[in-house]
């Protein structure tokens, strides 16, 4: 069993396998245990009271914490370089809770407009129903975020690599802007995963994930996570972040910045939005995600190799009108891929056919190896038409703002042999 005492010095690949679990000291089991329990016994009455007052650490109820979940949280935090993380039932829950931890009715956040369709709907339609305004900016122009910031702004939000557009955001520049105004930068790092990019190293304060995708990697398990860098000075901005700096009457007056210090944000995320609205991850799902993470580096290398090979093939095909993959030197965001991701742009690729929407439909229906579905980040290669699936609820102007065209086909490359993938694409293009 691995000795965790030197784990901070481990390379990424080693952390992916060992971080967060050193083996069971009682049974000597080396596989992650699944603690399938609802609640946990208190040593005595005072122990229970101290747990509920956040005076001591420990387990209370699986809606807010679980030992299997805790192992996953330690691993994700180690891979992202944060002080702690919170695992949740889905990526959407992670995004929602990251915002609800610091924002309330009357507040706003500033976000890139190029977002995953589910996130865009959350920001454009659901959060405003709760009084939280989302102001959209152009990821290509960091200064466009700054003009939207005011005294009620609680965060800047972006995706490292956008889904489905595949665009790359200059997170370092956004971090500078956010910090100049005393607000945190929240980054969705789902598409590159921490293997390709660690946003905290470039100034991000909070990282969110749909662990369903590349981290889990096998299309079996829905999960999400929030990672806290522990670096944002919440206590220095008491007026802007009152919920972290004033007594919480629901916890007998605890002040999170005083009780939890650098972990104030992630602590409140657990004991307020998670406790009160309950998007808890199941122990079995936490176990599944941990298994997936063990092979993350191997999968991401193969996925990136396949994606570049497919992008090169599509770029030279006469029926393809355009190809959008940031791993190509011709892509306008390629310099950012080199800066933040060592030249590897993950597995999201999109392109358009010269026959437009009809040709795209014929192409998708002719696929034999690629699976037609809306997930990404699987070991299997996947294809979808965003305008009629992931972004179907968006109107024409919203589609344009999100960078989604009617002829766009999105591919999520897996780990199959590249020659087989290209052969399937070739025959489907011939049928289109």
Across the structure, where does each feature detected by a protein language model lie?
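Conserved N-terminal alpha-helix of the aminotransferase class I/II PLP-enzyme fold
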Residues: 39, 44-96, 118-126
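N-terminal glycine-rich, Lys/His-bearing helix-loop that initiates the first secondary-structure elements
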Residues: 1-59
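Conserved PLP-enzyme active-site core in the AAT-like
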Residues: 2-8, 16-18, 22-25, 85-316
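Short hydrophobic/aromatic beta-strand micro-patches
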Residues: 227, 350-352, 412-414
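Short loop segments at secondary-structure junctions
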Residues: 39, 229-232, 353-356
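Conserved small-domain helix->loop->beta segment predominantly found in fold-type I
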Residues: 277-280, 285-291, 295, 301-380, ...
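PLP-dependent enzyme catalytic core of the Aspartate aminotransferase-like
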Residues: 2-3, 83, 124, 133, ...
């Amino acid at each position: 069993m691995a000795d965790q005492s030197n784990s901070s010095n481990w390379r990424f690949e080693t952390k992916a396998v060992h971080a967060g679990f050193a083996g069971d000291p009682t049974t000597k089991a080396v596989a992650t245990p699944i603690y399938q329990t609802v609640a946990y016994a208190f040593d005595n009455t005072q122990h229970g009271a101290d747990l509920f007052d956040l005076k001591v650490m420990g387990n209370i109820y699986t809606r807010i914490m679980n030992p299997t979940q805790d192992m996953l949280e330690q691993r994700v935090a180690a891979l992202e370089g944060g002080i702690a993380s919170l695992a949740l039932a889905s990526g959407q829950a992670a995004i929602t809770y990251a915002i609800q931890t610091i924002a309330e009715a009357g507040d706003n956040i500033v976000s890139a407009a190029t977002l995953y369709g589910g996130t865009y709907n959350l920001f454009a339609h659901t959060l405003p129903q709760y009084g939280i305004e989302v102001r959209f900016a152009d990821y290509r122009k960091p200064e466009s975020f700054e003009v939207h910031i005011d005294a009620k702004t609680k965060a800047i939000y972006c995706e490292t690599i956008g889904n489905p557009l595949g665009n790359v955001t200059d997170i370092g520049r956004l971090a500078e802007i956010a910090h100049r105004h005393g607000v945190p930068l929240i980054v969705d790092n789902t598409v590159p995963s921490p293997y390709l990019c660690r946003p905290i190293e470039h100034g991000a304060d909070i990282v969110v994930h749909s662990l369903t995708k590349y981290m889990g990697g096998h299309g079996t398990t829905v999960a999400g996570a929030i990672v806290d860098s522990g670096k944002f000075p919440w206590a220095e901005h008491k007026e802007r972040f009152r919920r972290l700096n004033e007594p919480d009457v629901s916890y007998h007056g605890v002040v999170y910045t005083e009780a939890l210090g650098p972990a104030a944000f992630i602590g409140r995320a657990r004991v307020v939005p998670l406790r009160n609205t309950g998007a808890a991850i199941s122990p079995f799902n936490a176990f599944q995600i941990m298994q997936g993470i063990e092979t993350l580096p191997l999968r991401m290398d193969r996925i990136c190799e396949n994606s570049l090979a497919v992008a090169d093939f599509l770029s030279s095909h006469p029926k393809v009108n355009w190809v959008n993959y940031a791993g190509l030197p011709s892509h306008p965001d390629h310099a950012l891929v080199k800066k933040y991701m060592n030249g590897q742009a993950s597995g999201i690729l999109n392109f358009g056919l010269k026959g437009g929407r009809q040709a795209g439909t014929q192409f998708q229906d002719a696929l034999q190896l690629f699976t037609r579905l809306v997930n990404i980040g699987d070991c299997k290669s996947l294809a979808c038409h965003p305008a009629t699936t992931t972004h179907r609820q968006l109107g024409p102007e919203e589609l344009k703002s999100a960078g989604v065209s009617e002829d766009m086909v999105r591919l999520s490359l897996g780990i199959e042999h590249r020659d087989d993938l290209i052969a399937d694409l070739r025959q489907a293009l011939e049928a289109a």
